[in-house]
Amino acid sequence: MRGPLEPDSADRPSLAILMREAPVLGDAETAEIKLSQATESLSPAERAALDGLLSRAPIARAVCLGMAEGSPFLLDLVRAEPTRLLRVLSDDPHAHLARLMADCAATAASGSEAEVMRALRRMRSEAALLIALADMGGAFDLIAVTAALTDVADAALRAALAFLLGDAARAGRLKPQDAADPAVGCGLAVIAMGKHGARELNYSSDIDLVVVFDREKAPLAEEVSAAPFFVKITQGLVRLLQERTADGYVLRVDLRLRPDPGSTAVALSTAAALDYYEREGATWERAAYIKARPVAGDLAVGRTFLAELSPFVWRRGLDFQAIADVHAMKREIHAFRGHDVVAVEGHNVKLGRGGIREVEFFVQTQQLIAGGRDPLLRNSRTLEALDALTAHRWIEPSVRDALAEAYVFLRRVEHRIQMVADAQTHSLPESRPAMEGFARFMGYPDRDAFAAALVTRLQTVQTHYANLFEDVAPPAVLDADLMFPPDENDRKTLAALSRLGFRDPAAASGMVRRWLSGGPRALKGESARAHLARIVPLMLEALARGGDPDGALAAADRFLSDLPGPQLLTALDRHPDLVRLLATILTAAPRLGETLARRPSLTDALLDPAFFDVLPDEAGLTAHLEHLLDTADTDEEQLDRARRFRQEQHVLIGVRIASGTLEAARAGEAYATLAEVIIRALHRRVWARFREAHGTIAGAQTAVLAMGKLGGREMTAGSDLDLIVLYDFDADADPTSDGARPLTGAQYFARFTQRLVTALTSLTNAGKLYDVDLRLRPSGRSGPVATRLASFATYQREEAWTWEHMALTRARVIAAEPEFGAKVRDVICAVMGQPRDPRRLAGDILDMRQSIAAEKGEGDMWNLKHAAGGQVDVEFLAQYLVLAHACAHPEIVDTATARVLATAARLGLLEPEDAHVLQRACRLYQNLTQVLRLAVDAHIVPADASPALRALLARAGEMPDFTTLDADLADTQAKVRTIFERILETAAE
């Protein structure tokens, strides 16, 4: 890339020279100061170069000042790296963009994940600045702007996918046709939809993708299954693009345009997708595919898929039913989102009356009507489609000209709105003073001049849109039909409920009327009922999407009945997306819904813009909790704050699982990390308070051992804490503490342990943290609650039963001073490495498994833990492998079952095929267990599970539907039991 101080090329004019228009400044002096401050870290030579460039290009200088005054987002990009501004202004814009994309692709081909993520984000930031400046300065017209934004998005997708596929190839899971370009022939196609597919992308909206794969074309390793492999690739793609880092994010990704997104995986086979569209495809889905374009991966697979889908999108005859269907979509947008009048302040230029969406619907409706018969109308780009409709006499040239001019104007307004703060919005400022500033940013002298231009375009679009639909009889609008007028037998209301799928519309109507009349305590006030009345239509539609509207409405009734007050209703009224999310929770995870009803303040966290970003890591959780505890006034307040912190984080993890934004398997680590952070914080504080009261013993140290699910980092929403507390002090020290209330030796540490357990388990005004189980300590219930390290080592070496050593395979130090923690780990490693008789070990494990089966039963396959071939079988096998082989292979010692199995396979201690079955079973059981613990209190009976829960389980199990999952689970358990018996019975002979 050319350096920032190199002169402009004579034959390739720089961006600064190409500019021909600029925003109008309101306060030039302040704008100068802002720009100067943002670029203050430039070197003297760089400063001179920038000043010289702007002095030679006064319009570019005016654009930069307009940026400083009107766009905090763009100014932040300059402030983060001022040479960025110099680079983009002094270079040919098209060549600069091409180099940015090429550099990113090169990093994806050879860099680490961290390097690729950084390269993607830096490309996006520099490209965003360049394109915005070119837009503001008139160097790019609308087509050039949207094409550049689309090119950058395409490049980011291709680079991220190339890295993921290359990573899979290096791991031996993918066998690419071309190692230098693993996307070629990979079998996976990424389809860009909407504006992205049409190369009409805007600045800040998300990109809509559909990801499909052809399992017959995928060059996968023999043991790799296509569906889970490509689902993981897709999830990785989303993470690489939208995870926020110190360098920002690249693109927000929306995968919800795929078939039946509530119950299908994020990547699905082309056969399954085609079958869905043939059976259930709706008009809106036909419209969505008008703009579809294969953008990354195996482009041949993508083109074949779209070709096979063509008969669904383009009906052979003239399809006038599309007019009513599209108009119904538009009415729902207006009804649900309140964009039904032309306005200026606060007007949504995309969804509002006369907005961009009406131009797009005007075009798409006529394409759907006639595109099946006339392929020349099948153009994905709005302006080109208007030309095609004119050429084929579907619209008059004057209509084309008016709509095209309005569309270009409105898209420029949309872009300028998004430039301000990189926000995913299409609405103009709400206040008149803010509109004055925005009008100048658009290049108008004042608000009134801009408003006149805007309203003219909005009215033009609205007129032509209305003319297209003037002969359409307006069917009952969902919103109006679900307003529940006084007549309790209102036929329109009952008909609307019936259309939504309610089996007993009269009962549903009665339930809603009870809410609106103030039945639940949270709805006693008139204001609360008004909030509810406004959200009822959207709530009913969202509840119905779960597949069991009547059951979902009953869950909503329980939720509203449990609400202690009306505050949540206000939030729901203001945030429609929260209504939809709550409906998902109530239908798929009622247990989580009960938690939210009891503590509605927890929903505040769901409104945080960062909610769907990456989960907070251990360092972030620790910093947050430490701040909360350090600023508490009393010990009691510390305990309350710890409990509220845990509840909030539990809800955030749970909602992420229910909404599909967090893999269920990763949730186990998230729950465990949260527990560790809390235990460490309280361990340190309880230890300090205890020593203040009782003094200390020379060399006194304590350690908390995590066992069980916490030790293996496989916790669920309902897991308790299996802990062991160990201690030590100087051998020659006085065993009596030196405080005002002295305690001696074992009593001292036992009392401390009791204090720690109380801090974790006691019920306060804010609830409780966890249940704690200390029964895995030496001698169980009969042993002391805290054990001296030397005694622990002796017991484990000389007295412990096989089951106790099995439990110890999952032991992990989570709270201790580093030196003492290392000593504890040494003891555990020594115990793990003891020579053992494999025959006796296998016999003990088989006996134990039979005892558990006799006590708990093993015939219910949905008792995932105890079923024959279930979790216990997998965990016992892993523990056998550790205890039998750690003496010769110490590297097999690990607290995580999945990693033990992987290491055993690598060492040749487990047949590859067995390892694959066991590892997949381990992942499947963990995924399903996460969902079940989140969703229900009692054991699941598949026939009784709601459709939404069955869909959530199928998604967690990476299966297309619950029936397939049920069969896969039975098959997996049978295979696991066969392996379990073969390995252990052979060893026991």
From Swiss-Prot:
It comes from the Bacteria. It catalyses: [glutamine synthetase]-O(4)-(5'-adenylyl)-L-tyrosine + phosphate = [glutamine synthetase]-L-tyrosine + ADP; [glutamine synthetase]-L-tyrosine + ATP = [glutamine synthetase]-O(4)-(5'-adenylyl)-L-tyrosine + diphosphate. This is Bifunctional glutamine synthetase adenylyltransferase/adenylyl-removing enzyme. GO terms for molecular function: [glutamate-ammonia-ligase] adenylyltransferase activity; [glutamine synthetase]-adenylyl-L-tyrosine phosphorylase activity; ATP binding; magnesium ion binding. Residues 479-989 are annotated as: Adenylyl transferase. Involved in the regulation of glutamine synthetase GlnA, a key enzyme in the process to assimilate ammonia. When cellular nitrogen levels are high, the C-terminal adenylyl transferase (AT) inactivates GlnA by covalent transfer of an adenylyl group from ATP to specific tyrosine residue of GlnA, thus reducing its activity. Conversely, when nitrogen levels are low, the N-terminal adenylyl removase (AR) activates GlnA by removing the adenylyl group by phosphorolysis, increasing its activity. GO terms for cellular component: cytosol. InterPro entries: GlnE, GlnE_rpt_dom, NT_sf, PII_UdlTrfase/GS_AdlTrfase. Keywords: ATP-binding, Magnesium, Multifunctional enzyme, Nucleotide-binding, Nucleotidyltransferase, Transferase. Its cofactor is Mg(2+). Its EC number is 2.7.7.89, 2.7.7.42. Belongs to the GlnE family. GO terms for biological process: regulation of glutamine family amino acid metabolic process.
